[in-house]
């Protein structure tokens, strides 16, 4: 499966109950063939609203840390979450949602 097909499949996914409450599917962001990958658990409210990973307070802190070690999500790393849709109230995903 190529990258665009994977992204298209994620954007259309309705395999678990999270698709009923999401605003956006939060796919990864950054360089697709990056040597450095950061993976979070699931998107929060800010990420769900913007459709981008790690854009809330945690993301702002992560960007500062990345800058300190000469990394950034636009040029040399990739940032994603295991779960692509926000669990309601930012709770842990249910076992139904786990892969």
Predicted regions and their residues:
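A polyanion-binding, active-site-adjacent surface
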Residues: 1-97
């Amino acid at each position: 499966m190529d990258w665009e097909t994977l992204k298209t499949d994620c954007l259309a996914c309705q395999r678990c109950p999270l698709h009923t409450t999401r605003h956006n599917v939060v796919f990864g962001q950054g360089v697709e063939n990056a040597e450095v990958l950061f993976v979070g658990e699931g998107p929060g409210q800010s990420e769900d609203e913007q459709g981008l990973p790690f854009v809330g307070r945690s993301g702002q802190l992560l960007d500062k840390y990345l800058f300190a070690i000469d990394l950034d999500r636009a040029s040399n790393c990739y940032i994603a979450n295991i779960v692509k849709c926000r669990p309601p109230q930012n709770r842990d995903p249910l076992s139904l949602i786990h892969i």
